[in-house]
Amino acid sequence: MKSPLITMSALVGKPTDKDIFNYLTDLKQNGIDQVMIYPRSGCLIEYLSEEWFCAIRDFIKSAEALDMSVWLYDDFNWPSGDACGKVTKNEDFRLKSIKIEGEDIGKVSSKSKHNSDIFGEKFFPDLMNPKAVDYFISLTHEEYYKRFGNYFGTIIKGIFTDEPSIGYCSQNGYLPYYDEMEIDYKDAYGKDFFDDLLSHSEDFCRNAMKLASAKFKEAYIDKLSSWCKSHGILMTGHLMCDNEPFYSVRYNGDFLKNLSAFDLPGIDEIATCLEDRTLMALLGGIEYARKEKGAMAELFALGPCDMSYAKKKCMLYLSACHKIDHYFLAISHMDISGNMHVCDYFSDFAVAQPDFGGMRLLSEDAKIARELAKKDYSPDLYIRFPTDISLKNASRDFDLTVLFSLLNELSYRGIQWKYICGEMPTDAPILELDDSLQLILNGNAESIESIISMLDKKAITDTYGECVKGIFRRRFNDGTAVILNLYAPEGGYVIDGEIVYLYEHSVLLNKCDLPTKKEALHCSFKVNYCNPNIVRLMTLNDSKGAFACADDELNVRFATRKDTEIKIDGACPELDLNYNPLPKGICEHYNITKEQSIKSEKIIIECQNDLKYMPSAMVIGDFSANIISGDTCGVNLAKRKGAYNIGEKFADFGKIELLARVRVPQGAVGIELLGTKLYTMLYLEGNLSGEKITAPYIFNIEKELWGKDIELKIVQFSSIGPIFGDVDYWDKNAKHSQWRGTPSTSETHFGFDEINWIY
């Protein structure tokens, strides 16, 4: 069975059939055998043109040859329903809103616009209009089926719809509106639409939103689902603003009902902020909507691009604990030219990442997570999703902090809960919010504290007996459990009366006894650098240049983005057309200068249009770099270290080997590395002992090596993150930003705190 990891593969530039085959081959070799073809900014092929469909054919044919699966995406960028502006060219197909408060009450606007930080002003499609939706399907779904119908249900598994919504034009004081809504209102409620509107009837907002919700479901969701079913594939994707219950209703109507109508319902968990106040609310929603085909989550899109594998794994298992078994990885870039358009966040599941080989291990973890998602658990409490109160207040901002606080407290106290809507289960108490946002349990008003006290479970505590936030436990009906360290500090915690050690972002499926008998390994390592170091030269805001200098005389080159001009100390550099060490997907967009010497005197590199994740200029060479951020940014370079001592940490980029001669003690069964987060491989006398992407980093030793002097080689890989330099400084100081995504940590460090023999 194929891995449940599915890359959202950004189709950018003008890839050839060979480019596509090579790209998919790279994914396949690294544990990924499902891709979603993702039309995105940076694509130079006209969307839905014959050239476009030729590229899609190349994807499908290559996937077939490699035994991979393909998912389609139903628009260009997001949100879905417009076919890259083709639908809204017809004014009758544009989303409408009606003013329900203040001046011009009752005015219907068919020319509403929504300002997008990324895409500017645009119209949005009316997904309550069946004719508009039929036109959208004819432009996209039908065109794909016309050309590739014989692959539907085999190579092609489904079509992804991204953030469709009826709320894009409904700012405060407005509601979604469709033609002849007033007729449906009269039929449904026996009252006049405009009489209730003008008299400010307390039921008007709720009633109107119910109609809009039903129309959205009938005209868009049900229609797409029916089309997909009849063509042998799945309709998947997610709705807008699904992380907050109120806004999920404001933008989509009856959120849980509409999401449940997807064949493979999904959520958008792109921030990977494991301490986010809305995370548990988001996961509870998809768990409710899950179908027999499963559920999906779009994950990791905001990065950072140097996110640890431990955090990725933890997010996969947290998703699985809420019955999610398809993991769409955002984004996999064929090349990074899309960063010219979507500039301020970057995540990459592709071979441009030096540590991409670790995806093979994450893929195996994902398969375990998928099986975990099949398990059920019994709730200690049911929580009625706040659909009604959200519908009543859909024309204004509304704060449901009390709900988020409750869900988080329950989750970290080990109290299991599930959403319900209209159901009346009897196997656990039911809690709901009244119109004043009071928590009502068994007919009585309660505080969060009193609810916790009544439902108290054995919470996970620290060694002082204090309840700990950030540790999540799921107890399944089959008697098994999962413990996840979402954001608590690494250390020992009391679980069921025993002290258990949890690493940062630990995933604990079974009780794991850590080694107690160990001995420190003392040696010095030779350092072998497998690639040149690469780091950006940042020119932020009004700055036109950056500087570089060196403690010792060094030879360096500069990478210059092909669409920019740079000068080095006032002169245009000479290019070397036969050398380019930049990673695949990046090298295509940069020229490399000929080698030159750099000394202690600063040289000035003038360049323009520097972008956060597509630098105008980078320096390349055999050096270590001290990044200096300020009004004028730069780098101070020094020789790379040739020897490494245990306990040191050092910044660099790419792949590094640490080599030493050691004598294996009698009785040693393993080697333990402490204090790293990197993808790490360990070799003993030239043979691979193992590879790890998460703690514990423990590698086995065969007894045949006892008492022998052997070569110990430790290989570590960084992410792509180090080449982008101090992006935290960029985020804090950039004057112009489209949208600040999750910042990079800028803290990739090679090395370890300790290395121990295990007995």
Spans of model-derived segments:
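Carbohydrate-binding surfaces of carbohydrate-active enzymes
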Residues: S3-N22, D33-R40, I45-G85, N90-G102, ...
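Glycine/proline-rich low-complexity spacer/linker segments in large multi-domain proteins
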Residues: D75-G85, Q608-C633, F717-Y759
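Catalytic and substrate-binding clefts that recognize carbohydrates or anionic sugar/phosphate headgroups
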Residues: D82-N150
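C-terminal substrate/ligand-recognition segments
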Residues: I221, S226, K655-A660, I671-T680
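Short beta-strand elements bearing conserved aromatic residues within extracellular beta-rich modules
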Residues: T564-I566, T680-L682
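Short, surface-exposed tryptophan/glycine-enriched loops
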Residues: P583-K602, Y697-D709
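Extracellular beta-strand-rich recognition modules
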Residues: E601-C607, V669, I710-Q716
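Short beta-strand segments within Ig-like beta-sandwich modules, predominantly Fibronectin type-III
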Residues: S689-I693
